[in-house]
Amino acid sequence: MRQPFNKVLVALKPWQGGLPLSVYHARFLAENLGAQLRLMSCVYEPEVSLGMLKGEAEALAAQVGLVESERAVLAELAASMKDWGVEAECKVCWGHPAEDVILAEIERWGADLLVLGTHQAGSRPHTRLAQVDWQLMRSCPCPMLLARDPQFEGYRTVLAAVDPLHRHAEPEGLDRSILGIASTLATASASNLLVGHVYPDPESFALASSVEVLPGVFYGDRKSTRLNSSHWITSRMPSSA
């Protein structure tokens, strides 16, 4: 069963210059899924917020100025997307931490998909993800797409990673949801859909006793595991995938 994406939320980072790479992916999805698109940005300045708590008129004016400045940036971005034939609305929020503001907007608007861009390669040691990204990956209530490459012309292959044997106590229906999301993206982009299940080789583990069994480690042979996994996947694949 495919999962519809009617509302796509693109969370932009105010400090990023130029055309955010997440916009390329969002534009493609909006065009091919017929989804409603919303660009959002979160702005916040601690000193301004403190001044507002004290009732300072200057701080309130500064807050309005920051929000309006970011709104103008989003409006310009939305206008450029309109030239591509995609309509996008804009939303600027004030708050901290950014992940909480984004999560609140997802719930308020009822977003079906969150699109977020990573940092440029080399801008952060060892990773292209910020703390905001990690927190959203942990708590986002809807599917989340992390875009990393601005040179984007569509998805050639969509990979759905599932665990039919449920060795890690996944939530009920998680694999079905993954298959539905992957099928939706693959169909919309006319790409190949691959479903994969990766499991440890029993021969790779030398267990001293039956007590020393870790999550994901099991007793069994590769042939039966592969057959069980393949049967589960094929029985739940969308009929037209």
Describe each region flagged by the PLM.
Residues 1-4, 18, 28, 76-114, ...:
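Structural beta-alpha unit
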Residues 35-36, 86, 111, 142, ...:
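Short glycine/serine/threonine/alanine-rich loop segments
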Residues 223, 227-241:
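Single conserved hydrophobic/aromatic residue that forms the stacking wall/gate
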Residues 2-59, 157-220:
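Small/aliphatic-rich secondary-structure junction motif
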Residues 17, 122-123, 167, 234:
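Short glycine-rich, flexible loops that bind phosphorylated cofactors or substrates
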Residues 4-6, 28-32, 103-156:
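Gly/Ser-rich helix-loop-strand patches that form or flank binding pockets
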Residues 58-72, 216-226:
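A short acidic, glycine-rich active-site loop
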